[in-house]
Amino acid sequence: MKHDLLKEFESIIMKQKLNENVKQKLLGNLLRLKKKKVNLMVIGATGCGKSSTINVLFGVEVAKVGTSVDPETMDIERYELDNLVVWDTPGLGDGKEADNRHSKRMIDKLYEKDKNGNLLIDLVLVILDGGSRDLGTSYELINNVIIPNLGENKENRILVAINQADVAMKGKYWNEEENAPEDELEEFLDRKVESVKKRIKEATRIEVESIYYSAGYKEEGYLQQKPYNLSKLLYYILQNTPEEKRVVYVQNLNQEEVMWKDNDDLKDYRKGILESILGAAVGVLAEGVANVVNGVANVVEGASDGISEGSDTGSDVGGAIGSIFGEVGETIGSAVGSVVGGVVGGVVGVVSSAVSSVCDTIGSLFGGWF
């Protein structure tokens, strides 16, 4: 069941015993959150698994969601999932005339600005076919079309993800029982990632982040192969999305536990995802509240207990969110939540409680997620 997370925020804030000035500041910050949109451009050649990736990340069949073609950027499909807008863009390799047309329309979209004058596209996710040995057209697209037109902070606005890791060596060395690469394939994939980064840096002087994963696949509605490194993919998507917009992803993530389970665990992606979501939510909601609190006496009943109360509540809530990840995640979540709750508790305990209660709701949305 899908929940309206931002409505949960509003409901909990309204129930708190807050000074009216603090409450209005929080509601104003919440309104800012509600207006945030993430525009994710997904680029890749036919057969690289763009649709599968979108489906498995967000738990939707893209053919069944609102699809439209932008009249000024023909060939670019637009999917709207609440405040998340996914722009599905073709890769190159369809002939010179088509490639020139695709390139021009991609560039136009990359230069497009929102109503505030900021670049519309927050992140470009380039998906490569891990089973292909010829990535020449993909490099041409990345080096000559995408990166030169990304504006400032180019490194933080592009992520290159190599899909179909399971067939990178024609199906060899993939452990189907473990749903993970064996040593030979893992080494091959690591080299491929480094090769991609090196070739892009040599051509553009830009150091991009690159990972490998497998979106898995379904046949006739039944899961035939689970995804691999999907948590890693989400982690890097969040890291490359403006912090104040990261909470937008929460309402749209796939809620099937099995989809997020298998990863290389080179990094603690669970903790990283928790910190991104919790930190972003707390940061936006608490922004400016300290200034209001400093000028108001007795802001909250029991405000003197703010630090300890916030820390305790944050720990409980972080644990609840962490339970999405399983037993290990619950421990991580408690630790992260304790820190976040303590920081906000230093501003005002009940604000921490309100934010933390909402974060508890985040955890409940996904049940056994991760």
Regions found by a protein language model. Give the residues of each.
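Conserved GTPase G-domain substructure that encodes guanine base recognition and part of the catalytic core
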Residues: M1-V85, T89-G279, G342, G346, ...
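Membrane-active amphipathic alpha-helices enriched in small hydrophobic residues
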Residues: R270-G306, G310, G314-F366
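Eukaryote-biased recognition of electropositive, low-complexity segments
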Residues: F370
